Structures are given as structure tokens and as C-alpha cells.
Amino acid sequence: MRSHLVRCLFFMMFVAGLCAPRAARAQAPTRDYLSEVEADKIRDAQDPNDRIKLFLDFAADRLKKFQYELGRASSQSHRAEVLNGLLNAYTGCVDDAADMITLAQEKQADIRPALKDMQARGKGFLETLEKLAKDGPELEIYRDTLDDAMDGTRDALKDAEKALKEMAPPPVRRKP
């Protein structure tokens, strides 16, 4: 009887050991502001330049959707949630792009094209956000989230500028 109990216990531990990695993989954290397709694109992009540009594309998309929602004449009961959700998604994309810059710097990857793209597009994002802060419709609904988005964009621009200054110059190729 005792040996049967021991065998049963070992069998259950074996099954639990096989199932545990699958359960952990199923609970892998996903960024709730990225769709499955977008998350796959980020995962598939191996180059930090590509990943940063993808995050900037997704941020631009969220900002465009936010502007579209603002322009819509709608009396939705959850309008505030939609607007704040889009701004939070924008901020998450910009923050992730800034995080990718930091990671690429640590790995000493050449991300100059992505940094220049971040500076150019980030300034445009910031101008749009500042314009909304001055005279955006229904500002009281999303004021705090808008302030966070502007702060995140400014921080990302500072990170990009700092990274561009700290990055070693590209190697000079000499003619043979």
C-alpha cells in the first residue's frame, strides 16, 4: 500500500513538472495596449532600430486614433475610458521605445537612424499634445493622462538626445 502511495505521489509530481512550464507560458505578461499582431511584429523584429521604429509607429497610430475619437460627435457613456485608454497606450509605446534605446545603448548597438526618427517624430507628437492641452475639446476628461503623455514624450526625447550624444562616432572607412 505504501509503495503504491509513493508511486502515485511521484507520478503526480512528474505530471505537475510537465504542466508547470506550459502554465507559466500561458500566463506570460502581454502589453495590453498592443494587439497580438503588433506584439508579434515587435517579437519578430531582431534589430533595435526596427523595434524602436515599430513602437513609434504604434504610438503615432494611438495618437491618430485619439484625435479621431475627439473629433467624433459621440455621447458614449465610456468615452472618458476610451480617450484615456488611447493616451495611456500612446504613452506606453513611447516609453517602450525609450526603454529600447536604453537597452540598445547597453548592448552598444548602432541605433542612430532610430534616434533621429525618435527626435523628429517625438517633436511632432509633443506639438500635437501641447496643442490639445491648450485648446482640446473635453479637456477635463483627459487632462491628467494628457499631462502624463507629454511628460513621457519629453523624457523619451531627452533620452534620445542623450543617447545620440553619448554614442561613439561611426568607424571611419579608409580607402585601400
What are these regions (language model features)?
Residues R25-P176:
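Long, charged/polar, soluble alpha-helical segments
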Residues M1-M12, A16-A20:
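Bacterial N-terminal signal peptides that target proteins for export
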